[in-house]
């Protein structure tokens, strides 16, 4: 008998033996095994469903805690730390093949710098792969001021809905206003944010109609639409420009950079006010492309310094187009939303005037100091004017540059340091303190109560971190004083604290003792610091992103 036949015969004997032992015919054996398999699958399914419900319950409880009970500082700190670490892991796993990748600390530094929109660089951007650039795009989107404030608005809205569901007995936010009823002119209403305001005038509501106001939910949709529309339109505009301008397109071809990746990266970076570009020299190759610079400037302003006035303008336009009274209500009562970026009309005008005045002041100073400087050689008057305007807009928060910052005069650098120190929403005109959002007042009195004893002055904080940086870099300060001078260190700390990203860089030509192994790099001055110094700058970037909670 052949071996295969022997095996088949043995299997048949085993099957018959099992059937005899069970006192069942051969046809019943597969059915019994099938039923047992079904019971096992059902048991495992029940276990998985039970575990999934436990996980869902834990997630729901954690979400409720974050939304309703946790301090905003803790929420944002956890958010930035977790996303930064996730970005670091993604950058580490997507290293370009065939090239020596950056150190882990430099990748972590890059992730933190991108998420906090600081654009402090310790690696050369052109060394990153296309997939790593897309990771940075996601980090910039998630770290931008518009996106993070939008998440906070979602939390506020969820908290309001939760309170409404838990207190069904309370009156809802509805008004039954009759057009000819004078008794209703002095009524008060209760909003979902828990505050009472006087009723709107009769010409802003419809006759004999019940109107429900949910300002938080309405504003969530507006901010989300603003965010999505601005990012998409900015990317499309830059892509169209590179389709038209062959010279700009050739710059990317010479660097072997994908045009679409560059356009989307630049649009997101500009809107998020990060300051990174896929090029080592940032925007310097396009300093003569004044049309491109003019296209990028509105994107930078729309993502930060002028976001509040533009948001109010969007609400006003939607109200005019749709004719809905809820938009007029939001404009009249911005504090009801609890959104810090929505101000009354007067404050919005003050912000526009302050931003415009500061930009024009910078342009005047830089033109007087740098018009005939070496950094602007080869540019005509229009290119110089637009370039300096672009530089002035970026000094406040974004950090993109068409110039080598280290070649500018000391007076210009001092001006940059002062402007970087100023918060992005600072207004130099007097504003009414009563216009502060009501939710912010609650936050000041309740949420920040635990942290009030830990608040420190901004200047004291900068002095402390500068002192720590001088300690970690003391060897370089003594051996390389021209590069590691006090002003360069202070400038770097202020840039990290302001989440701007300007840097004086490092030059091998400034070494007291020439070193043949020294190579100039395009990344920032902090890239030459020790690991301890880089960790200090990471803390400064986190602190700068969260300074509104713990600094005064």
Swiss-Prot record:
Q: Please give, as recorded in its UniProt entry, the membrane topology of this protein.
A: Multi-pass membrane protein
Expression by tissue: Expressed in shoots. In roots, expressed in epidermis, exodermis, cortex, and sieve elements and companion cells of phloem. In mature leaves, expressed in large highly vacuolated cells of the adaxial epidermis, phloem and xylem.
Pfam short name (any one): TrkH
Transmembrane regions listed in the UniProt entry: 71-91, 133-153, 222-242, 291-311, 349-369, 402-422, 449-471, 524-544
Alphabetical GO CC annotations of the entry are: plasma membrane
Q: Which signals induce this protein?
A: By potassium starvation in roots.
Q: Where in the cell is it found?
A: Membrane
GO biological process, any: sodium ion transmembrane transport
The reply to whether Transport figures as a keyword in the UniProt entry is yes
A single GO molecular-function term is: sodium ion transmembrane transporter activity
| Catalysis performed (reactions) | Na(+)(in) = Na(+)(out)
User: Keywords in UniProt for this one?
Assistant: Ion transport, Membrane, Sodium, Sodium transport, Transmembrane, Transmembrane helix, Transport
Q: Which residues lie on this side of the membrane: Cytoplasmic?
A: 1-70, 154-221, 312-348, 423-448, 545-552
Q: What is known of its domains?
A: HKT transporters are proposed to contain 4 pore-forming regions enclosed by transmembrane segments with each containing a potassium channel-like selectivity filter motif.
**Family designation:** Belongs to the TrkH potassium transport family. HKT (TC 2.A.38.3) subfamily.
State what this protein does. Answer: Functions as a low-affinity sodium transporter.
What is this protein called in UniProt?
Answer: Cation transporter HKT1;1
Q: Which organism is it from?
A: Oryza sativa subsp. japonica (Rice)
**Could you tell me the gene encoding this protein?**
HKT1;1
């Amino acid at each position: 008998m052949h071996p295969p036949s022997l095996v088949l015969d043995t299997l048949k004997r085993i099957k018959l033996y099992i059937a005899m032992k069970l006192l069942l015919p051969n046809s019943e054996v597969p059915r019994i095994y099938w039923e047992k398999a079904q019971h096992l699958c059902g048991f495992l399914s029940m276990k998985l469903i039970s575990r999934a419900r436990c996980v869902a319950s834990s997630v729901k409880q954690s979400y409720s805690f974050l939304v309703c009970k946790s301090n905003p500082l803790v929420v944002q700190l956890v958010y930035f730390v977790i996303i930064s670490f996730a970005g670091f892991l993604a950058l580490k796993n997507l290293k370009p093949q065939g090239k020596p990748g950056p150190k882990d600390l430099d990748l972590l530094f890059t992730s933190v710098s991108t998420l906090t929109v600081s654009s402090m660089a310790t690696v050369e951007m052109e060394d990153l792969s296309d997939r790593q650039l897309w990771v940075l795009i996601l980090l910039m989107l998630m770290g931008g001021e518009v996106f993070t404030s939008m998440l906070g608005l979602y939390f506020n809205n969820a908290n309001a809905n939760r309170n409404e569901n838990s207190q069904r007995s309370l009156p809802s936010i509805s008004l039954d206003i009759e057009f000819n009823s004078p008794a209703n002119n002095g009524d008060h209403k209760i909003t979902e944010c828990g505050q009472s305001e006087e009723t709107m005038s009769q010409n802003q509501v419809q006759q004999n109609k019940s109107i429900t106001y949910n300002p938080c939910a309405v504003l969530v949709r507006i901010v989300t639409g603003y965010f999505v529309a601005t990012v998409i339109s900015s990317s499309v505009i830059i892509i169209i420009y590179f389709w038209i301008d062959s010279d700009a397109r050739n710059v990317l071809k010479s660097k072997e950079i994908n045009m679409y990746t560059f356009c989307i990266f630049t649009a997101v970076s500009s809107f998020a006010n990060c300051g990174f570009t896929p090029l080592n020299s940032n925007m310097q190759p396009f300093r003569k492309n004044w049309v491109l610079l003019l296209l990028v400037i509105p994107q930078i302003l729309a993502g930060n310094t002028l976001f509040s006035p533009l948001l109010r303008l969007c609400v006003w336009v939607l109200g005019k187009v749709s004719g809905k009274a809820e938009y007029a209500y939001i404009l009249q009562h911005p504090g009801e939303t609890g959104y810090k970026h929505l101000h009354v009309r007067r404050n919005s005008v003050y912000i526009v005037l302050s931003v415009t005045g500061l930009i024009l002041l910078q342009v005047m100073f830089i033109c007087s100091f740098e018009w005939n400087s070496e950094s602007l050689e080869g540019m005509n008057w229009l290119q110089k004017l637009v370039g300096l305007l672009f530089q002035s807009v970026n000094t406040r928060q974004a950090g993109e540059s068409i110039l080598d910052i280290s070649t500018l005069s000391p007076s210009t650098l001092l001006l940059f340091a002062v402007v970087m120190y100023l918060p992005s929403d600072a207004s130099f005109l007097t504003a009414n303190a009563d216009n502060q959002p009501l939710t912010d007042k609650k936050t000041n009195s309740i949420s920040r109560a635990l942290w009030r004893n830990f608040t420190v002055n901004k200047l004291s904080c900068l002095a402390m971190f500068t002192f720590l940086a001088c300690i970690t870099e003391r060897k370089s300060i003594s051996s390389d004083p021209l590069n590691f001078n006090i002003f360069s260190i202070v400038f770097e700390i202020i840039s990290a604290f302001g989440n701007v990203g300007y840097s004086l860089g490092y030059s091998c030509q400034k070494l007291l003792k020439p070193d043949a192994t020294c190579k100039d790099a395009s990344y920032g001055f902090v890239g030459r610091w020790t690991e301890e110094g880089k960790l200090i700058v990471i803390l400064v970037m986190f602190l700068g992103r969260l300074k509104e909670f713990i600094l005064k």
